[in-house]
């Protein structure tokens, strides 16, 4: 037994959440109540920010004040993260993407620029392919694991050759909706359970704030491939209709012997993403940052804002 069992989530806000400088609110999208924060002038262009896996909306809070000088900014918690609804058995890219389509319709209510990190970057790609006509003006994919988050990708390593074993570890010992919560047992088991090349992955004495706000069933959905069972990445990229995409590609190292990837995409996968987007008629601005961590907006917020503003200004020209 452990005192972390079933302790975290919207059912127990006092144990799970902390306050933030920017106010939060919930909107009813049907299956889920989506939590979000917004700042900026209502007359400014709309910018939707989509966090990555284990990240709540407040991962963007350092970047939001500068962005709010130019946009009305909306940062969301995806289903299963932050204060948004947990949906057992329902964590798929299509469900998450359609949540965002409804959010744009009901809350933003006008054409939107979208930027997403990691799995949020994959959802940014999803929106640029499958959102309603006219909803998305332009899309930024911030270090997205396109192909690399699939179990059987069309090119390059898949989820089980990169971060996947960590997701599997979390879900095994923490359980769907934190139903097991065996944090100490997970820490003890990690050295023998994780692949040798991941032995140094940090696991603290207690859950981080990010993990408290995360449903570990997300990790299982990626490990098993159910998250993308109906959303093949190559097909999705061939379907992109948004005219402009900014693709940022951050730190990555590939083991030549095993093919294991430390990072979100290999160079080959990034090249294939660009190739498919260009074939679809998209104008792609690819920017490589091999020394920048996975979350540029988290670790280098000024760099993130500068790049985003520069790219958007170029679109206006």
Regions found by a protein language model. Name each.
Residues 49-52, 118, 249:
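Glycine-rich His-Gly loop
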Residues 59-61, 84-90, 150-153, 257-258:
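Conserved catalytic-core motifs of eukaryotic protein kinase domains, centered on the activation segment
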Residues 110-153:
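Conserved hydrolase catalytic core segment
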Residues 144-240:
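Helix-rich cap/lid subdomain of alpha/beta-hydrolase
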Residues 241-292:
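Conserved loop-alpha-helix segment in the C-terminal half of the alpha/beta-hydrolase fold
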């Amino acid at each position: 037994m452990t005192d972390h069992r079933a302790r975290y989530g919207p059912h127990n806000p006092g144990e799970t959440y902390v306050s933030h400088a920017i106010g939060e609110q919930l909107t009813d999208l049907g299956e889920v109540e989506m939590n979000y924060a917004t700042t900026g002038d209502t007359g400014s262009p709309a910018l939707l920010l989509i966090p990555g896996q284990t990240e709540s909306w407040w991962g963007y809070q350092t970047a939001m004040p500068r962005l709010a000088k130019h946009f009305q900014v909306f940062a969301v918690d995806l289903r299963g993260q932050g204060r948004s609804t947990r949906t057992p058995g329902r964590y798929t890219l299509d469900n998450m993407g359609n949540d965002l389509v409804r959010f744009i319709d009901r809350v933003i209510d006008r054409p939107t620029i979208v930027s997403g990190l990691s799995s949020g970057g994959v959802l940014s790609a999803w929106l640029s392919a499958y959102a309603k006509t006219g909803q998305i003006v332009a899309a930024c994919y911030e270090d997205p694991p396109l192909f690399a988050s699939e179990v059987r990708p069309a090119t390059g390593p898949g989820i089980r050759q990169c971060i996947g074993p960590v997701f599997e570890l979390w879900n095994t010992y923490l359980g769907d909706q934190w139903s097991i919560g065996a944090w100490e047992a997970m820490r003890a088991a990690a050295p023998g359970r994780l692949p040798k090349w991941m032995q140094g992955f940090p696991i603290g004495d207690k859950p981080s704030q990010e993990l408290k706000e995360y449903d570990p069933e997300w990790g299982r959905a990626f490990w098993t491939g159910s998250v993308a069972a109906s959303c093949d990445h190559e097909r999705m990229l061939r379907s992109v209709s948004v005219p402009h995409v900014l693709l940022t590609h951050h730190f990555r190292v590939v083991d030549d012997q095993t093919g294991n990837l430390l990072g979100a995409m290999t160079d080959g996968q990034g090249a294939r993403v660009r190739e498919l987007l260009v074939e679809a008629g998209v104008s792609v601005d690819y920017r490589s940052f091999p020394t920048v961590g996975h979350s540029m907006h988290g670790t280098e917020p000024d760099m993130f804002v500068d790049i985003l503003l520069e790219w958007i200004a170029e679109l206006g020209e």
